[in-house]
Amino acid sequence: MADMKTGIFAKNVQKRLNRAQEKVLQKLGKADETKDEQFEEYVQNFKRQEAEGSRLQRELRAYLAAIKGMQDASKKLTESLHEVYEPDWYGREDVKMIGEKCDELWEDFHQKLVDGSLLTLDTYLGQFPDIKTRIAKRSRKLVDYDSARHHLEALQSSKRKDEGRITKAEEEFQKAQKVFEEFNTDLQEELPSLWSRRVGFYVNTFKNVSSLEAKFHKEIALLCHKLYEVMTKLGDQHADKAFTIQGAPSDSGPLRIAKTPSPPEEVSPLPSPTASPNHMLAPASPAPARPKSPTQLRKGPPVPPLPKLTPTKELQQENIINLFDDNFVPEINVTTPSQNEIPETKKVESLLDLDFDPFKPEVVSTGVTHSPMSQTLPWDLWTTTSELVQPASSTAFNGFAQDTTAFAVQSNENVTETLTEAEEAPLGELKVEETPTAAVVEKEAILAEPDEPTEQAAESIEAGDKETTGIAEKESEVVSAAGGAVAVEDSVVVAAGAGEGAVRTEQEAAAEGDKPQGEEKDVDVSQEKVSSIPSVVIEPASNNEGEGEEHHVIMNESKDAAAEMGTQGTDSETSQIGSEQKATEEIQTTPSQDQPASAGDTASDMPPGFLFKVEVLHDFEAANSDELNLKRGDIVLVIPSETTADQEAGWLTGIKESEWLQYRDANSYKGLFPENFTRHLE
């Protein structure tokens, strides 16, 4: 018995050695290898089929586990409802019965899925291990076949032929070939059949799953409807104890889409900077989202973001000294465009109250003054451009005169004399220059009667604003007069003590001497109504980008301020319009000559039906062919819209100025764009 076991063991070891030797020879290329490419393809399909079936089995078990979890959760939910149900409430027994039936449905659904799908899938996958074993055994028999064949060939090709050994080798070769052919034939028939049957198995499995799930949902929907009816009757029984949630959506009808844009919640403007700190940071809002096109029931365009506000760091040396005083009380009186002004109150502040950020970069002063009207502009005209808000020119801070005008060319001696006179003069005796007031009255006339000469005068004023710096180096007298006009364009806010702060030329003194004394008093009184002394000026946080847009924003603000202030004027101020307008036109004659075209020529070059210009504040990407692709800083010429629905929804029709100047075709290049992505220029 022991000898028999030893013989079998030795025989198996010999087979393993022969197979290993044959594989080594085949790897080294010293022995050829029998290959069946078609069978190898069958093996690859078998491996793929086994992997797909294993994954399907794994996911189906996870699905069944989820069903079991839903069964437990549903059971606990109905049990908790039954526990809180009062005995005198309607449908107590019905609720209990519905819960029990729901649990039975979940259990039946789970069991049928296990019997009809999971067990079938397990049976389907059960045949793969056996086939896999037979494939491995066939591979070993193929090696034995190659080994026997090589051994027989070696004996037949040897010089010394041994017929006995050759005969024995032939018998072994035939035996190995027979065993290999048996495995190979069976697998050649079974593997393709198994691969083709996978389609029918998938169909039957998922048909069973879908039918069971549909039946389950249909039956449990009836129970849910019964529970809904019980709850409805319970609510009718206790109608006086109804519980409503404010703001909860109702299912009484479809949702209504509003076409008009809803403005954001505006922060109420501060009555005065002393009422609350004027150096607080405004909350930043995200970039506006792209609105929908008008063909898709577009709503109003979104709200542009609010500008960030930071305190200015450009304080004079005298102001810094006063800040460290224990009794530092800044007298702030910011004039708003509204007529109902709230009387200012004084608030004791210290340097610790100011929110200075030492990590913000220093901003170079540009000499441009913003009107405080920009703090109370409507929400759809706010911008996030890097326009700098500087202290008002020719203003006084705590009684000390400041000269911040960048357009007047003065020597060091003149500046010293001016500061000395401002310090010695009493605050009540200081007068305001008449040039800003006259320019404001002139703007009132321009808004009231927009004829062609007046528009040319406005174009001349804008041209003078751009070229005053270059002319100031050549003709100081013309520069001084133009600086007064530019001060009006830059800001409507004029300090009460700013009149003596600027050096007047001989021409201005002569012009003032010709005016009646009564008119001069009226101008002083009306100018004092809008004067202010801002001590802490806020500016938008920026990186000095978009400074080229300053001029347009300032012109827009000053025109709005002039329209508000013009209603408070007297008849005596209106009588000065003619003389002041002529003086302004004479002052601006030199820079206006350099303009390439007049306002009349520009109007003739506009597209048909031109209304006004707007500047794009945010990038807008068109979603439809009837919309414009806009980038920040583009100028758009607005023309009448074809439908009023677009205007009501907050959309405008226009053509980009660059495309109009290049193609002169409004019909081909016009398109829609959101109005609150832009601001008006004229």
From Swiss-Prot:
CDD domains: BAR_Amphiphysin_I_II, SH3_Amphiphysin_I
Composition bias, Pro residues: 261-274
Keywords: Coiled coil, Cytoplasm, Cytoplasmic vesicle, Cytoskeleton, Membrane, SH3 domain, Synapse
Gene Ontology BP annotations: synaptic vesicle endocytosis
One Pfam family in the UniProt entry: BAR
Signal peptide range in chain numbering: none
Basic and acidic residues composition-biased segments: 503-527
Subcellular location: Cytoplasmic vesicle, Secretory vesicle, Synaptic vesicle membrane; Cytoplasm, Cytoskeleton
GO molecular function: phospholipid binding
Stated role: May participate in mechanisms of regulated exocytosis in synapses and certain endocrine cell types. May control the properties of the membrane associated cytoskeleton.
Oligomeric and partner information: Heterodimer with BIN1. Binds SH3GLB1.
Listed name of the protein: Amphiphysin
Organism classification: Eukaryota, Metazoa, Chordata, Craniata, Vertebrata
